[in-house]
């Protein structure tokens, strides 16, 4: 069963926040939606109760898109104790995925991913692309600290330019899958 279109739709479509109904609070409805998303995600990766389902789903989603684009994705070898998610003939990819119902500051660690992986371009001899999927993309587009879009602060622009000068770029998943999404 090919689930690519369904997975892309999940990654690009922020769900509506629940409204109180049927005597259930918004909080209770939110928990139900989070559980349903987790069950769906585990189904997409062929597992039952994997709490980290977004990691596998996001990585596989990026692999499938890169494969469709003819970029020859594969698992890179470990170098200097680093093992990024994917390597193609021209790039190294690190995938960051958040489910839609994660709360709090869970997604903030992606802001420093470029620092953690600052040496990857030199180690592998290829630029690093950090792909942000689902809520991770949404937060970096519409949240307090924007990495995507036109409304970047001057300091954030400086940070992203520094990362770029090191061979590191953040890319929203919507951009990575753009051509596939338009033709499907």
Range-by-range predicted roles:
Residues 1-75:
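Acidic-basic catalytic patches of nuclease active cores, encompassing PD-(D/E)XK
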Residues 56-60, 114, 153-157:
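Residue-level marker for well-ordered alpha-helical positions
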Residues 62-70, 117-124, 159-163:
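Hydrophobic, Leu/Ile/Phe/Ala-enriched alpha-helical segments that form helix-helix packing faces
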Residues 77, 85:
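Core catalytic machinery and nucleic-acid-binding channels of phosphodiester-processing enzymes
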Residues 82:
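Beta-rich catalytic cores
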Residues 86-99:
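Conserved catalytic cores of phosphodiester-cleaving nucleases, focusing on short active-site segments
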Residues 97-151:
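Catalytic cores of nucleic-acid endonucleases
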Residues 129-184:
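Domain-level recognition of nuclease-like catalytic cores that cleave nucleotide substrates
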């Amino acid at each position: 069963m090919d689930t690519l279109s369904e997975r892309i739709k999940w990654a690009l479509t922020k769900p509506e926040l629940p409204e109180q109904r049927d005597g259930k609070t918004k909080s209770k409805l939110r928990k139900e939606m989070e559980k349903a998303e987790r069950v769906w995600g585990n189904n997409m990766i062929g597992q039952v109760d994997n709490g980290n389902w977004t990691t596998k789903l996001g990585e596989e989603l990026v692999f499938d898109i890169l494969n469709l684009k003819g970029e020859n994705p594969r698992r890179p070898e470990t170098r200097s104790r680093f093992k990024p998610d994917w390597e193609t003939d021209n790039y190294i990819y690190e995938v960051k995925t958040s489910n839609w119902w994660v709360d709090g500051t869970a997604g903030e660690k992606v802001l420093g991913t470029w620092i953690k992986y600052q040496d990857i371009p030199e180690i592998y001899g290829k630029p690093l692309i950090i792909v942000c999927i689902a809520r991770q993309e949404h937060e970096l587009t519409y949240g307090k600290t924007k990495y995507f879009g036109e409304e970047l602060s001057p300091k954030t622009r400086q940070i992203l330019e520094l990362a770029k000068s090191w061979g590191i770029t953040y890319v929203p998943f919507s951009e990575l899958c753009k051509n596939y999404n338009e033709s499907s």
